[in-house]
Amino acid sequence: MTVVGELDPQKLTALVATAAEILDAASVPFVAGHRADSAVRKQGNDFATEVDLAIERQVVRALTEATGIGVHGEEFGGEPIDSPLVWVLDPIDGTFNYAAGSPMAAILLGLLADGEPVAGLTWLPFTGEKYSALVGGPLYSDGKPCPPLGSPTLADSIIGIQTFNIDSRGRFPGRYRVEVLANLSRVCSRVRMHGATGVDLAYVAAGILGGAISFGHHIWDHAAGVALVRAAGGVVTDLTGAPWTVDSKSVLAAAPGVHEKMLEIVKSTGKPEDYL
């Protein structure tokens, strides 16, 4: 039985084991570089630290040599994401947290096969948490298999939501994001803003969060986490309810049952363009 094309489960397991060793090695400079200064200014007020750049170089080199599969990284790009097989890397998810000294930062690594996430790894070096999964599950936490997600209620769930500026415009204006947050807060147990999309998705997969919303579209923020949530038995769509793909402009990931309720609330908020 194949997973995608000629990628069988045994080969996929070996690839993830190799990737885990590479992320373990990358965790050393990750921890050592905490509170690193900005090295590269990007669009808007985003930036990359020198550690981002160094870790991406290290992981790309190691993955390419060990697996023969190309890598698409946040900082340097690389292999096209529609390649038959490609690793997708975010060397530091939560760069602002990382530079400020917050432990809510992670290394994200997903494996796409013809655009479909077939494996994901999310390492939180400061907390020691390691999440990994293959397509079909289960989710592994620190190397141990986890039971599938249950069906909690939204009222009992903590929900993660992406950070924002209320005055921002663009595809999902700040005022729209605030209204989504407000409407969710009336129903869910608590709302949390970790400032790291990949951490939110890993925590959904682990059952720590009942659900999470990302208003972003970058593949490196989502590839690993989508694989984790799906492997754990969760549901991943965009904010319209369409199944998530590499072309999606947003993410709504949640446990069964919670996803349906969150989607209802998001849809009831109206169209983002109405908040410009």
From Swiss-Prot:
GO terms for biological process: inositol biosynthetic process; phosphatidylinositol phosphate biosynthetic process; signal transduction. The keyword tRNA-binding does not apply. Disulfide bonds: none annotated. Substrate binds at residues 74, 92-95, 192, 221. InterPro entries: Inositol_monophosphatase-like (IPR000760), Inositol_monophosphatase_CS (IPR020550). CDD domains: IMPase_like (cd01637). Mg(2+) 2 binds at residues 90, 93, 221. Keywords: Hydrolase, Magnesium, Metal-binding. Catalyzes the dephosphorylation of inositol 1-phosphate (I-1-P) to yield free myo-inositol, a key metabolite in mycobacteria. Belongs to the inositol monophosphatase superfamily. This is Inositol-1-monophosphatase ImpA. It comes from Mycolicibacterium smegmatis (strain ATCC 700084 / mc(2)155) (Mycobacterium smegmatis). The gene is impA.
